[in-house]
């Protein structure tokens, strides 16, 4: 298979291309020839919908997998959290690469922690789960939906403060220019009078003029002009200046890995949220590559990309999610972590407003983790998770 080109489908978003690029790099390191094929999905066309709503329909996955099943491409790269627990019969998850940090982060312009956000602060999120977790942890905060990809959401967060600073600097610059004009007119008038006075002490006059200039410079509020200030902004901040969001957000909650992969992690203030209190989405931080079950590319992909530990962890998470039956309809977090002979698995199921919660952390036997995962989910359903999920389905 190494001599045959592998056609790999991906979405065309910045994040998707970066994710696919990681897979391509690994395959090419193994001397495989790879062609990346961009495919537009329903999720790319519907730009005014929340990601949580798009997830209900498999909007980011279906078009890519259709290309695989039709033989147009050999395989497709997905974010594991977007992949439905029921995969078409003709497809197989051929490989699950090493998972990156699955944690969520609180994003603010200045690095404020969740505990320190003032009551009434507006927190934006595109996820039902994240919204419910924030409300459960900090009931006094106002959780609002936010649309767009990773970069768009960050720009919406930064835009209002940047606009205010731009206004402040523009007004100060106008005032300084007006003051300079008045001083110039006053100086011209004084010079006209002094020109007609005999025996004028020229040196004293020049000294006084210099003093006037120093007073004007010292009264300037900003060292930079508005143009110089704008030019000093980062590309992210300059792009944010072009946005005029309907809602002003004080913070966002989003996946750390999305910020990392788009190169934005170090351009904003973040607080990494504990995976114990803010349990991530099933498969968060992981990628997967799907292929036709009968394709000879399956072994090639598995040999080059498979990370066994990640496969076990995300499989345990997906078994719990499938047994719960919530999918993207209800606020559900599931996070599994291999620890020796056990798999520590944390589950949270919330009401949409975060006021009710059913959850548990349990050690699953690595030898029978799928069975244990089903039992964990069944126990949670019996303890009220089923009712929360049904309520969410009714409200959807």
Swiss-Prot record:
It catalyses: 4 porphobilinogen + H2O = hydroxymethylbilane + 4 NH4(+). Residues 159-224 are annotated as: Disordered. One of its GO terms (cellular component) is cytoplasm. GO terms for biological process: heme biosynthetic process; protoporphyrinogen IX biosynthetic process. The modification S-(dipyrrolylmethanemethyl)cysteine is found at residue 328. GO terms for molecular function: hydroxymethylbilane synthase activity. The keyword NAD does not apply. Residues 159-245 are annotated as: Insert. Its cofactor is dipyrromethane. Pathway: Porphyrin-containing compound metabolism; protoporphyrin-IX biosynthesis; coproporphyrinogen-III from 5-aminolevulinate: step 2/4. The keyword Protein transport does not apply. Residues 200-215 have a biased composition (Acidic residues). It comes from the Archaea. Coiled coil: none annotated. InterPro entries: HemC, Porphobilin_deaminase_cofac_BS, Porphobilin_deaminase_N, Porphobilinogen_deaminase_C, Porphobilinogen_deaminase_C_sf. Binds 1 dipyrromethane group covalently. Residues 162-189 have a biased composition (Basic and acidic residues). Gene3D superfamilies: Periplasmic binding protein-like II, Porphobilinogen deaminase, C-terminal domain. It holds the Pfam family Porphobil_deamC. NCBIfam families: hemC. Tetrapolymerization of the monopyrrole PBG into the hydroxymethylbilane pre-uroporphyrinogen in several discrete steps. The porphobilinogen subunits are added to the dipyrromethane group. Belongs to the HMBS family. This is Probable porphobilinogen deaminase. The gene is hemC.
